Amino acid sequence: MSIRIHPQEQIDAKSRSGALGPIAPLLLPNLQRLYSQRAERLRMLADGHPLTDYLCFAATLADAQQQALFDNPLTLDLAPVVANAAANGTPPLATQTFARTPHWQRLLLAIIAELRPQAPVHVLPVLEGLEKCAAGEREALASALLAGDYAAVGSDRALFLWAALSLYWAQMASQLPGRAQAEYGEQRHVCPVCGSMPVSSVVHIGGSNGLRYLHCSLCESEWHMVRVKCSNCEESRDLSYWSLESEQAAVKAESCGDCGSYLKILYQEKDSGVDAVADDLATLLLDAKMEEAGFARSSLNPFLFPGE
């Protein structure tokens, strides 16, 4: 099964025929406090953590995203985009085909301005370099980053470019009209909004109690994926669950013997404050254990890009 976003009128017609189920296949981002709450979570996790300094810096970057969001609102008419994507069976905000506007660069400059007074000394040259480079060069770097060409960008610049691009995509995703529905098809392992990889998955409480959603590493949307099924290849016969603590741990890794990949699962019932990005970043020791066991990560954390 795959998830597609359709114009509201198409969904209404199918709804009258009873085609929609009770499970929300897609949860678009609520940006009101997303980044400030992530910053709070990162600071809480940083207390006594071996990576205290980096987690605190990540929190500062999340705060900068929240302020840039407040200072740079975005309003777009995305109805034509959704209609075109529905007709072609593609994500409406697909990173490789969606025409970016200069807004994301304004977000980048706003984030840099927020960070500069409190950034570590070794980070300042990176921020200044991004600030001074030409708009066309920034666009080229963004295209390379979104295409997964991390070596062409460098992990130092990728962090800040992605922070701006992610905020831009999240602003658009939060405004998408229409609704999503599950359909037969492939590509369930990537975001139905933008086509990006997940960062981790979250088992919800509340209205979506017990349901697992994959959290997009770019646009912050979440899409439903049934539990006890590999999020990468959708096989279910050889899954194992790993944790650093006990079976009651709030963060586990689900490994698949069929494709050799793993993805972390965060359980809100164990800790209601878990954040898909923050808790993934704070459990890098679990990643190390999974790699030692021979599994490859099937996700991307926006605070941790591969080196050159």
Curated annotation (Swiss-Prot):
Keywords: Cytoplasm
Domain of life: Bacteria
Coiled coil: none
Keyword Cytoplasm in annotation: yes
Assigned GO CC terms: cytosol
Main location: cytoplasm
PANTHER family reported for this sequence: PROTEIN FDHE (PTHR37689:SF1)
Function according to Swiss-Prot or TrEMBL: Necessary for formate dehydrogenase activity.
Protein name in UniProt: Protein FdhE homolog
Classification lineage: Bacteria, Pseudomonadati, Pseudomonadota, Gammaproteobacteria, Enterobacterales
Gene (name only): fdhE
